[in-house]
UniProtKB/Swiss-Prot annotation:
UniProt keyword Protein biosynthesis, yes or no: yes
Family (UniProt): Belongs to the SelA family.
EC nos: 2.9.1.1
Organism per entry: Escherichia coli (strain SMS-3-5 / SECEC)
Name the record gives this protein: L-seryl-tRNA(Sec) selenium transferase
Origin organism lineage: Bacteria, Pseudomonadati, Pseudomonadota, Gammaproteobacteria, Enterobacterales
SUPFAM superfamilies assigned: PLP-dependent transferases (SSF53383)
Catalytic reaction list: L-seryl-tRNA(Sec) + selenophosphate + H(+) = L-selenocysteinyl-tRNA(Sec) + phosphate
Signal peptide feature range: none
One Pfam family, short name: Se-cys_synth_N
Cofactor(s) listed in the protein's UniProt record: pyridoxal 5'-phosphate
Compartment(s) where it occurs, according to its Swiss-Prot or TrEMBL record: Cytoplasm
Post-translational modification N6-(pyridoxal phosphate)lysine, affected residues: K295
Cellular component terms per the entry's GO annotation: cytoplasm
Amino acid sequence: MTTETRSLYSQLPAIDRLLRDSSFLSLRDTYGHTRVVELLRQMLDEAREVIRGSQTLPAWCENWAQEVDARLTKEAQSALRPVINLTGTVLHTNLGRALQAEAAVEAVTKAMRSPVTLEYDLDDAGRGHRDRALAQLLCRITGAEDACIVNNNAAAVLLMLAATASGKEVVVSRGELVEIGGAFRIPDVMRQAGCTLHEVGTTNRTHANDYRQAVNENTALLMKVHTSNYSIQGFTKAIDEAELVALGKELDVPVVTDLGSGSLVDLSQYGLPKEPMPQELIAAGVSLVSFSGDKLLGGPQAGIIVGKKEMIARLQSHPLKRALRADKMTLAALEATLRLYLHPEALSKKLPTLRLLTRSAEVIQIQAQRLQAPLAAHYGAEFAVQVMPCLSQIGSGSLPVDRLPSAALTFTPHDGRGSHLESLAARWRELPVPVIGRIYDGRLWLDLRCLEDEQRFLEMLLK
């Protein structure tokens, strides 16, 4: 060991001496004595490695307390951090999909802070059923006879098939054998549920007679799957639920539908593309309809199944139901969200998902123009900051080919270097409240459709 190396090692402080320093008192109060000591030992090991490798001290050796504070502050950050979603995708799966209504947030808070009547009947002091209150609401909204709630729509499809078709065949059109995110495929789910897939028709055309010819003594269900995350256009043919139900009655085979997104209101009244609604399928005679809680419905992640009482009873009594059931926070949020649908006149104001989807391009354009000046003043030396028209998407596999006119702030590097865009995007992801946009066509785009808190946005970007 050289004299220089020995000198560097001698400059490393003892942990006891550091802990006696007044600057470490608040750190120990905040993070605990044990964690501070663990980190100091780790940092001393790191410093020794640097000395061995480069014959220098790490820069942070000038201020150990500051480095400890920085590391522990970062370590203490929640894994689920709030972000500002300016990607242009309203129901962004990676960012948690639907924002919850204030009523849902309040309901969850109450459910977390107090015992609740989750499975307790106040009338007779006996055991109740956790789905009962929501089932009544869902029946009122959809016209179904009964309802069942699980933790997501994938679970709903699995339970629906396992409870009603295990060991038997389920007939599905080849054009509806969907795959959603995370490699969730209808054929795979059927195998897990113990069903045999009997696919009929072709990718683009399926006729009623295809279903008729497929039915045999081992057929349990005729199934429709709403292709919510893709669209087949051109020379196509598909039969709707009403026609399939008529065929099912003739052949004595029930019809079930995986609706996916599941809007409970006609979106066309808000100028949005229409999606099939559970209540329409129930009216058409479908025996079971499954859909998501956290997509177009605008509530928490949940799988909802509505339909005929006898079929729902089979789901409720299946062993998988307990494994897939929703917890009290999910049920509280979902109940509060569903109650908003009882007052449709105020829905677009009280339900964040619908409020964001129905923002007009003109309003967003005015907002973008208002924000452009301060951002151009701050970033103008490196980037051209402009207001540009753009198209938002709904996301989460909902209405895949439809886009919503919107407006964006774009940042274009004066030197045209893409690395500057990557650097800017990375900088914004490191903010206390990260700002998430998207890089496209040589620009960093901030689609403002989902921006409601302008003050917080400017506070972040003008740091």
